[in-house]
Amino acid sequence: MNKVLALLFLVFTSAFAAAKKPNIIYIMTDDQGYGDLACHGHPFIKTPNLDKLHSQNTRFTNYHVSPTCAPTRAALMSGKNAFEAGVTHTILERERMALGLPTVADVLRKAGYTTGIFGKWHLGEQDEYQPHSRGFDEVFIHGCGGIGQRFAGSQGDVPKNNYFHPTIRHNGKFVKTKGFCTDVFFLEALRWMKTQKDKPFFAYIPTNAPHGPFLAPEKYKALYKDHAKGDANQAFFGMITNIDDNVGLLMKKLDEWGLADNTLLIYSTDNGSSKGSRVFNAGMKGGKGSVNEGGSRVPLFMRIPGTTKAGKDLGQLARHIDIFPTLADIAGADLGELKLEGRSLAPLLKDDTTQWLDRTLFFHGGRWPKKGAPGKFGKGDLNLDNYKYKKFAVRTERWRLVGKETLYDIKTDPSEQTNVIDKHPEVAKKLLTEYEAFWKRARPLMVNEDAPLDVEKPFEANYLKQKENGGIPEWKVPSL
């Protein structure tokens, strides 16, 4: 009898603990920079819902990602520096995250979570690289690095796919959707969340917007006719306001469904701004693709009522490699022998006075040419190791070394205007030595450098096969 009672107690307490695990929603936009928010000082952009979320959140104001998108996604998923996860580019097979690396979705699923992705994956097109093979239960994605894109090698989305009414791969089957892409991704994510009552969920919503080509519904572009010149600029800002509306809808539904108080809601972006950095860049140098502050420093908002502090800014140096250990920590997941590069941010969310030691972060633009690649992608120096010292940076709390010859004191010069390398040569030497050790460690792990390009485009091929054999059904717009 006592054994039975003990077993029942164990089952009850385990179920109670599982029920208390917070849901996790991670929203990541594409090519939106730190300055592309009204709450960060932008003079005319309209982001009322994100501004509201900003006021409710703990904000990491010194959070950094990679200069371009696929490397950031690899770091988020693997908890490792992108080069050490095999990702050095956004195309040419170099966007494929190395096989054998456990993902944050794998770890959360083992911790009792159901997992879903809605939007842009961009870490490999072959089935073994796709999210359904990397820990995701629910998959609703476009192909390639952008809707309608195609490049040499395996990357190729559905032919002639468009931001409006895109064809999406849903759990292995393609469907023809109705609506603007960002609206579609959020609606499907919300439909799925609404059905997840028995398990905590991890919903990853990496939007394709505001990545180019710059397209937005007319009502959103119209908001910027008096502020931005040209259709593309108006569309860029309109895409962000459209994202804002969808974040507002998500927040509303979380409240309606009684999920808000037990949901960690995270908002961030994948790299610095593309269009926006030319308009307002929060005083930073550089944008997407740059190894200056404007290429890597992006928003990171985290909200979970009862844990995070509303309106609290945290200036500790943080990076995308910290997201994996943070989510695992909050979910109570067992990492076992898994070694991650990052640190959990969870202690800072609970107590902002927690000791946070200085650290050294490494950045590289990647994107070197490849033998056999067409056009500009195959031109230039084809020796990878000759790019070791090209377009790299090293960051600590105080310093940013950009290349071998430029050192900025970020504490006193956040806009990177004054090179102080002559005053602090010992600092530059130390950072360069650390970078060289990083490159030596990462170089053998760049496993995609010699991958052949004369391969099938599996995402496109699967679409064409389904179209020929049974057709592409229409997606049912969710009723929320």
Predicted segment positions?
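Sec-dependent signal peptide recognition
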Residues: 1-8
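Formylglycine-dependent sulfatase
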Residues: 2, 16-403, 412-433, 437, ...
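Hydrophobic h-region of N-terminal signal peptides that target proteins for export
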Residues: 9-17
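A glycine-rich phosphate-binding loop feature that marks nucleotide/adenosyl-phosphate handling sites
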Residues: 450-455
